[in-house]
Amino acid sequence: MIGVVSNPRAGKTIGYPARINRLKQILGPHGFFREAQTLDEMRDIAEEFRKRGIGVLAIHGGDGTLHHALSAFIPVYGGTDLPPVALLRGGTMNTIARCLGIRGLSETILKRVVSTVGRQGLFEVVRTNTLKVNDRYGFIFGLGFPVSLLKAYYKDQSRGRLKTIGVLLEILFSMIQRGAAYNDFFHPFQADIWVEGERLPGRSYTAFLGATVKEVGLGFKPTRRAAAREGYFQCLCTDMSPERMGLNALRVLLGMELTGERLIDRLASRSVIALERPSDMQIDGEIFKNQTEIRLSAGPTISFMRPKA
């Protein structure tokens, strides 16, 4: 049986209740369809699906919905017993699905899943590490400049590659003008950071990224080695100057790699960040405010279902 958990407020679903109805019709007698907007609701659904013994967990929504679903389901299932996960997309940001090569409309993907499960057909599985951030599970973590970039991206309702280019241009102009936007984008954070138990030498940083997928959102692909080793995530940390950071952001968007002597680039299984002052962090595109201590570790490996067309 298939267990579908849907976020009715996902970006491409809100205001379109007919989409939810279509998904329910496609699922039909092949499983259970549940809606959740909070982590507590997700936990209740996880408990139900575990008791029912579902064979496939289908998640309808974007990166934020996936992050909340895994944060609820992984503890309930004990981390290692989670069934294969089918990403139905449907959110404003679908970075993880895109990284895994999952494309198409939510309805089309669910039809393929139902067809494959119904005839007990074989399907391709893509195994991907999760990243545990304190008590949450996701795939992308950011602190400093990555958070500033997201905040600028979320300022209005427009989305897409043109919006990303517009944000980068705003960054470049701020570097020239040295105004308030400059300080907002490049305000450093002070912290003691440990990677694999080793304390990094600095205390002032402009950016920290941890990821288990090669794209970290908005078209940026700085973590190309993120999936190189099971049980590890790629860790990028730097105290680059604002000018160097802005130029590197442009390089990454153009498909080039990060450069600079002041860049720490490692594969790690754990990291601890002790912040001098509360700072905002992001997990899979969602911003969490006023963090003081952040513990990162490689989480369980998820088997993602990639049904064939």
Predicted segment positions?
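Short, solvent-exposed amphipathic alpha-helical segments in soluble enzyme
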Residues: 19-22, 74-75, 154-155, 224-227, ...
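Short glycine-/acidic-enriched loop or helix-start segments at secondary-structure transitions
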Residues: 14, 68-70, 96-98, 150, ...
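Glycine-rich phosphate/pyrophosphate-binding beta-alpha loops
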Residues: 142, 146, 209-224, 287
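Catalytic core of DAGKc-family lipid kinases
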Residues: 36, 78-206
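Cofactor-binding loop segments of dinucleotide-utilizing enzymes, especially the Rossmann-like FAD-
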Residues: 6-9, 90, 238-240, 307
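ATP/NTP phosphate-donor binding region
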Residues: 1-60, 65-71, 75-76, 110-111
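ATP/nucleoside-binding phosphotransfer catalytic cores, i.e., glycine-rich phosphate-binding loops
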Residues: 195-202, 221-309
